Amino acid sequence: MSITAPTGVTKYNLGKDSVDLLYVGKSYSLNLAMDNIFHSVGSNYNDFTVTVTGVGSVTCGSYSQSGRGAGWSSHSNIVDFNKIAKEFVTCSTSGNTLSINVTKSLYDYYESKETKIVEGNGETTTYTNKLYSINTDSDGNKPYFLVTVKHKTLGFSAQYKFFIGEEVSKVSPSKTTITF
């Protein structure tokens, strides 16, 4: 079995490796190509489980935002990307199709938030374990998502690696002249 990447997807350089780049707010359909040595697979072999894992780590911290400004009070908590990977994507299968829906940007992640009135600042929102940065591992790679599709009874499987980003649809410069 293999997973065919969706059309029109670009590659993202993780560092040492490259993976497909999927965009926030978009859904993707990938073909689960079934094959054997006889090149004949029946239609009853489409009962799969799907798991999403994260490979690598990110740095999170405490971030506060008020009417007087915003800033980090700490950002040294290293979090295993696998613990938060399911916050960003949902995956399912139907027949021989794997569907991936990218629901949230990496930098929108936080574990919890609290809003209260702080003397001198007014209404202040503090985000706990908000994503601060993505880390590079010893192989030179940034974190990525790994989807594993496994047949429930026969046990064969295939994997698909990707990273998520935000698509830019329009750039509007504020000045009409660029000076070098």
Q: What positions do the PLM features span?
A:
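Strand-loop-strand motifs at the edges of beta-sheets in extracellular beta-sandwich domains
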Residues: 88-108
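A short beta-strand micro-motif common to beta-rich folds, especially ectodomain repeats
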Residues: 129-151
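Short, exposed coil/turn segments at beta-strand boundaries within extracellular/luminal domains
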Residues: 151-158
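Extended non-catalytic scaffold regions that mediate assembly and binding
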Residues: 14, 60-65, 72-79, 114-119, ...
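Solvent-exposed, low-complexity, repeat-rich "mucin-like" stalks and linkers
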Residues: 8-80, 174-180
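Extracellular interdomain linker/stem segments of modular secreted and single-pass surface proteins
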Residues: 7, 165-171
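C-terminal edge beta-strand
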Residues: 1, 158-166
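Short beta-strand and strand-turn-strand segments in soluble, beta-rich domains
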Residues: 79-85, 89
